[in-house]
Amino acid sequence: MVMCWWCFEADASHGCPVKMSKKTLSVVGWFCHVRCVKAYSVLMASSGDQVFRNSPVLTDVAAGRRVVPAPSPRILLDMGGKMSRAEWRDVLGTDRVYSEAGWMQDRVRGAVWPV
């Protein structure tokens, strides 16, 4: 059992792309969802880690679309937040964005509702 490096979910099978050549995509880490990959890559790139400097863009390229980063895992119940793992997985399946104010927003429809 390998855990996600972002949300600690027990079903991790994705890697974070750090380098791309014509035939190879080099990845590091283990993640349960492409949105967790994107969130981790954005965090690491913004911290100045040179290994991850291109990872946010490479994640989009590898996924074939613009990927919305997963919310912070601090919102999960088992980390002191208000969101269950089931709700978390539902959010990962959409393009919803969680803000620090505690609101979910559906970017496609523009609907806003409290968590």
From Swiss-Prot:
<protein>
    <recommendedName>
        <fullName>LCDV1 orf2-like protein</fullName>
    </recommendedName>
</protein>
